[in-house]
Amino acid sequence: MHADPAIRPDATKLDIEVFRLEPHDWVPNNRKLPVVLYRNALQIDPDIDADERAAAIEALFEEHQWPPRWRDSIFDYHHFHSTAHEVLAIVSGEADVIAGGPGGRVMHVRTGDVMLLPAGTGHCLQSASGRFSVVGAYPAGQQWDIRREALTPEEWAEMEGLPFPPSDPVLGRSGPLIVYWLRAGRI
């Protein structure tokens, strides 16, 4: 792993939360793949500014075949992506993010946390503080969409047929994606 020293993934400090979300109203979530929340995934040097942090996270994701696509916050309305899995790294600040659609599970995230959302997972920013900023990335070859309505049966089948990413966005050839997603794919 060649991560920028400004952000150092440290598997020994990771606290992993894994959970599945059932379909909820118009939000499909993902029946096979769990949400993976990497707490303390990135040991971020507090002396570097947010732009340097974001660039270092982008380099890490790029190295692991998850090309970064944007820097911003998370939309404050419920939505999901049907054409791509998504990884979100918290560059600065902290927030409460709802996963699963309206009435879903609230995840409190802070600087250095990473959220891995399988395609179909509803998410929405509930509240944020401390100049909340995120880097968003998607597996190589997957183009994200923004959905706010139910999928057709054909779209649902396409979503469930998306290929597995080739590596974990944080740890590469090892890590939670390999453990939890590949295991789920064999069920």
Locate the predicted segments by residue.
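Short, conserved beta-strand element in jelly-roll/cupin
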Residues: H81-I98, L116
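A short, N-terminal "cap"/entry segment at the start of jelly-roll beta-barrel domains
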Residues: M1-H79, I178-I187
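Conserved metal-binding segment of the jelly-roll/cupin
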Residues: V109-S129, Y138
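A generic structural motif
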Residues: I98-G100, Q126
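A generic "binding-loop/recognition-motif" signal
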Residues: E94, G103, T121-G122, G130
